Amino acid sequence: MKQLYKKSNLFGLLFCLMFGSAFAQTRITGRVSDAVSGDAIIGASVLEKGTSNGIITDIDGNFALSVSDPNAILVVNYTGYGSLEVPLAGRSQVDITIAEAEGLLEEIVVVGYGVQRKSDLTGAVGTVKAKDIERIPTASVEQALQGKIAGVYVSPSSGEPGRGATIRIRGTGTLNNAGPLYVVDGMLLDDASFVNPQDVASIEVLKDASATAIYGNRGANGVIIITTKRGTKDRKAVVSLGSYYGTQQIAKKLSLVNGSEFAQMYNELPNNSSPLANPAQYGEGTDWQDVIFRDAPIANAQLSVNGVWKKLDYNVSGNFFNQQGIIEETGFERYTGRFNGEYPLLKNLKIGTNVAYSKELLQSVGGGVLGGVYRMPPIYSVFDSTGKYSDPTKFGQSIGNPAADLFYKNDQDTRVNRLVGTVHADWTFLKDFTFRTNYGFDRRNDHFRYHEPVFMVTTSQLNNLDRTTRDTTKTQNWLWENTLNYNKAWEDVRLNVLAGQSAQENYYKKRNTINGILQPNGEQITEWAMLSYLGRVNATFFDRYLFTASLRADGSSRFSKANRWGYFPSLAAGWNIAEEPFMRSQKVFNRLKLRASWGITGNDKIQEYPSLGTISNELYSAFGDTVQQGSTLVNYANADVRWETTRQTDVGLEFTVLKGRFTVEMDWYRRFTFDILSDLPIPDYVGSGAFPFVNAAQVENTGWDFTLQWRETKGKVSYNLGMILSPVKNKVLKLNEGKSEIFEGRTGSGDFSTRTAVGSPIGAFYGYQVEGVFQNQEEIDSAPNFGIEKPGDFRFADLNGDSILNSMDRTYLGSPIPTLTYGFSAGMELFGFDIAADFFGVKGNKVVNAKAVARFDTPNWESVWNENHWTGEGSSNSVPRVTNGGHNYKMSSFLVEDGAFFRLRTVVLGYTLPQRWLSNIGMSRARFYASGTNLWTKQSYSGFTPEFPGDNSFRAGIDYLSYPMAKTMLVGLDVTF
């Protein structure tokens, strides 16, 4: 690993010593605002005319830009407004107002290692700006992306506070971790949980290979670039305060039987030796959801100060976020602090830093609470007549009182302390060259603690040993990158050339103890390192013809020397058709661009050391009763293991019509991923359950991204409408030799519920097809069955027609991967009021209601069972009889439900006080608002929510009784001084 960095250190040193002279530049600061309302224009592009040197305005409309000439001309553009040229005439401070325009304006987009004009962009990049993030309160940056960008599927991992989200960009392209790369202020990371959404200036999602190949072996699953807010560039400090408070409720409760309905159904159980007398006496009984779920508060407070102090541009912020869970004794608390600053040491040399600290506390409860809610009979109250917790073991040893679990298993928490940041220096010389050195770091400490006291509720709900389990993890990650950028503009040509080097190292250590004693295999240490070289060329000719080429070489310590290096090229071209002379007379298109790209990227989210054999230490009783320490092989070595690789092709069309009001972007893409790492089965006679990793599998994703947007301003009224559509098809093209299928995702019956095979999607559901319910013995005798069926049991299809019912009759039952994701948004601002609403939905996916397997071995049922279950011949052909055995519990189409949904994700109503009311009290802005989240959902699924994708692609879409989603109502206030 040390040898890997000898080249890195030498390369960086050569960069630093390469040039010894520089030319001065002039630093310009200013603010861009609306010519009518005076409101700040957020995200406007400010360019030095004749160059690609530019920047975008921040949340307050402010900008700072170093120009080559004190008499340069600034070109200011923003969608929906007119383009404006501003001669500097020696000024270093300019306030600019722009008005609504007839034509289309320029936009600046953040890309890998730089920025580009939207009109020059050849890649597929989606953007969410600060204004869109701030108007809708969210707990994480992942939530802010849901339904916002075509091709980006965001689904919460759980409804539990503090849990992250699963993000898939243009489908699932691997059998391993398919999560994207995050780049936060230049630091390359696997997650962005530490980022406070209110600190974000913009989020860019890089989707095609032209945009992601510059990140090489980490770009295959897409890249999310997060840029946080900088100083306002004003001389005086700007202080912003924001706070909101609200309440949360469970978004949807299960419809379960009441006490009397339960007693009646229980009495129908076959071989029931102790029926319940007089079912009506139990009445409504106890809805255990009301016992465990609660209304829970949510609160947030934000303070930020930004400005300039003695040439230091700064943005300082602090945030407190607290979200209590809708299940008792659960919740999440986070403190964050951030400092972003930049200081010009010389006219051509500036240094800066972006540092964030976060402290998190996640409180959870032990297993059994949600299961008890689902399985506990409603005829019981929380306590029995003696004041003890009720004992439900009469109805099954596996049933526990959820209130008791909540009381005895609530001492569980995870604490996270994290420091993430970058330190950089930018040196401009020879007018057109900029050298940047950037050092990034990520220091993270996690401490999980779970204390379970001695208790006994029943003979099956107890704990005999007072114990405290602790998991402590320490992660240290550093990154050092050096880039040289050449920007040159001629009359009809703009050229940008980037060359760079990157080095990164990660150290991870985990330790597991119980009551202070280190457990077998309780300590784990992993390290990896990466050395990379990168380059890119962007060229624009006559504002019409666009070309991009990039190449990155990555060397990784994860692989053997023979396969350590991977090379990831990309090519792209674009044609701004609307800029052609033959288009100048037409009045339809303000913008019309065709683009195409091709490239290769890799996936580094794989198991550590796949090329090496690994062992695990275990305790064995191999010699009588004496326990001995031993070791077992986990996987065999394979020195030929190499990168997972994705080859992607993209064709896109963008156009804007109706004087810049209506914009359409559409892309067709094909992602072909090959050399996917998978385990290779070995013969049983080898005598080990271990396996080697091999590059064998292939997966294809094809689809479309559509984005439609309408923006219009008339006087003091502005409104916008937006829609995204993202159809995608996922298919496995190849698996390992000798391994034609992969089974995963066991249900409570022990059956596997998913099968990954050639020709089907990853993690497709697989099982028996239910044809109906046997109505009488004659039907059973005349049909293939398992041999113990009774009237009222499922009739499974004999799909291969051999008159024998067995595992060969299982079939494809649907996919957890949506074939279509879509979103709608609408917003309006008028006379100080603003209203916005976002909708999000998916179609074409299925979910497995795995928790329903419990209905075949322990009592308690949903209301639909009471209403529709089989009670005699002709009574039902869809829901079986009440039973506690047989084969009805097998993985079948009965457990598979429609996973489609359409949700009102957020709605916000706000009012901004007029400026004239605030000037006398020192305020520059004050806005009150009310917001609702997850207020309405249209779904067919009978469970809490159809969203439970999980990080494991083989087990996505299986409901093992996940934490329910909450709906939220809150009020808030934002003020600026």
Residue ranges and their predicted role:
Residues 43, 95, 107, 127, ...:
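Extracellular/lumenal ectodomain signal focusing on beta-strand-rich modules
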Residues 279-281, 621-634, 672-696, 729-817, ...:
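Surface-exposed, extracytoplasmic segments of Gram-negative outer-membrane nutrient-acquisition systems
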Residues 80, 219, 230, 245, ...:
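A short beta-strand motif that forms part of the nucleic acid-binding face
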